[in-house]
Regions:
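Residues within the DNA-recognition helix of helix-turn-helix
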Residues: 48
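Pre-recognition alpha-helix immediately N-terminal to the DNA-recognition helix
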Residues: 18-20
Length: 106
């Protein structure tokens, strides 16, 4: 069972995983294609995909003898919802701070 939450943010905290995630935004890809141009090996890319999958951000499916990875819409939606909640709270806090009377110095 996949749970969506803080693990998503932790997973995307790694620059290589973020790059893999961004490549999957464009289209589904196999490990070899994802590894091309990255400063890590194919096995390392597989490990990064495992973390992204555990965080609920990607899913995979077999195609012949390869696995094709793509973004998991449910995981991406959950991540976006968390960001929306954070942004709403941050803007409300900023508004409240901006509306506070200021003390005059002098």
């Amino acid at each position: 069972m996949v749970t969506y939450g803080a693990d998503s943010w932790t997973a995307l905290g790694d620059p290589t995983r973020r790059e893999i995630f961004e490549r999957l935004v464009e289209r589904p890809r196999a490990v070899g294609e994802l590894a091309r141009g990255l400063p890590v090996s194919r096995p390392a890319v597989s490990q990064h995909l495992k973390v992204l999958k555990a965080a609920g951000l990607v899913v995979d499916r077999p195609v012949g003898n390869r696995r094709i990875y793509q973004l998991n819409p449910d995981g991406v939606d959950a991540l976006r919802a968390q960001l929306d909640r954070f942004w709403t709270r941050a803007l409300a806090a900023y508004k409240a701070a901006a509306e506070q009377p200021t003390e005059e110095v002098g």
